[in-house]
Structures are given as C-alpha cells and as structure tokens.
Amino acid sequence: VHYVSACRHDGIPVLSPDVNESGTEFTATKEGVRFGLAGIRGVGTGVAQAIIAEREAGGPFKTLHDFVERVDSSQANRRVIESLIKAGAFDSTGYPRRQMMHFVDKNNPENIIDAAVKRQKDRASGQTSFFDMFGDVEGSGFEVSVPDPDGQEWDRHLKLSQEKEVLGIYVSDHPLRPFEYALAKARDFSFSQIDTGYEVQNPTGGTINQEIPEGKALWWAGMVSSVSKRVTKNGDPMGIVQLEDMEGEATVVVFPKTYKEAEGYLYGEVD
C-alpha cells in the first residue's frame, strides 16, 4: 500500500497486472509501474515465468481463449486463471471480468478450461484433431467460437473487493475514491503521513519531512475493512479492527469499554 501510495504521490501511475505486459515483479513502462504477475495471490513465480515464456515465444495473448489454449494447463490451472481475471490481468483483451469468469466457471458445461485441457492431453498422447492438422489455434475452431464482449461487468464494489482479494491492495481504483476530498478535509493526517511523516516548507527553501509527535491526538478518516471479535479472559467482548484509507492501513485494538460503546459503528461497508 505504501509503495503504491508513494508512486501516486510522485505522479507515477500504478497499473494493474497484464498478461501481455507484466514481468514477474513490478515493471517500469511508459505508462507507469506495472504490477507483476508473481505478486498475484495464487499465481507465483513459476507460473508467471511460464506465462511470460509463452508470450515471448508466441506473441501477445489475443483473448482468454487464446491464453488457455497456449499456456500449459498444469501451470495455469483454473484457480490460477480465476486469480488472473480477478486481478485484471486480462482486461487489455477487452472482455469484462464477469464474462471471463463465466468462460472458466466449472459449472458452465462449455467452460473453456476443460476443453483446453482435453486438447492438450490429446496432443500429448499423439491424438490430433481434424482442425489441428490444418493449422494453429486461430484456424482450429477454438478461436472462431469466441463470443464478442457482452459489456456486462460486475458492480464496482465486487470488482474492487475481488481485486484486493488477489492483490492485497486496490490498484485500478479504490472504494473511497468518491469520498477522497471529504476524507482529506475531515482528517488531520493520512495513515501514510502517520507512518512516515509529512512534508512541510523549509524556511531556507525546499521541503523537509516532519514526523508526527508520539502521543498526539488526531482525527483520522477512512473505512473499516475488517473486524475480528475477541473475548477477554473475563468474557468481555473486544475487537481487532483493520482500518484503511487510500494511502495505508493500520490494525487497531479496541478494548472492551470502547468496544461496547463503538460496536455499532464497526460494521458496514462503503459502496
């Protein structure tokens, strides 16, 4: 979160992972810093390297169908592909994430992963199909059957929550974006400033970093991202609360007395 915040503070865009552009780790591009494939939960370095190797050997992936046909299913299995979709790694192909998840849904009898696995097994056993004898994927019937993008995307909240699930942070957007101005007005400092300090003008010129004094009371504004309810030895409820703003996050322990007073405010979500 702090890395992303620092880049954005310096005017450097942080871009979602992309199967056609990402490296294994963060990569500098003309447009900004591209999130690495290995940083996606459930993908890992080995799978990322296999994807990059196929991209370099066969060129950019045209569609999700093209991807599952070309990348070994033992490397990029259903779980990996679902994580890539949630992370936005196929967004550049022009298909909504919702539609692509339907393409790979195991409950979809026409899901493309089962079809690709069968084709790869047939090739490995020397059983080539009629179409395979006449050319590559583009002429095989697999690519021809790809439907057009339907334009039906998940709602913003679901899309972002799944993105954070696999990336650990929000990259393409943030749930608090519509409230950014109001939050800045309501708070004294952001979590990033609390953690690393903030810039102030130097009387002799330029800026210097000013740290926030220990023990200083201040106002903070953001959202509760998770609450873990605990019970003390005396049986009193308390909470471990994860707070988050657009620049950072922090874990706060809410002891029984305060928890009893604030419990009703510690649940809910920003749409």
Residue ranges and their predicted role:
Residues R78, G94-Y95, P175-D271:
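Single-stranded nucleic-acid-binding OB-fold domains
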Residues V1-E211:
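Sliding clamp-binding short linear motifs
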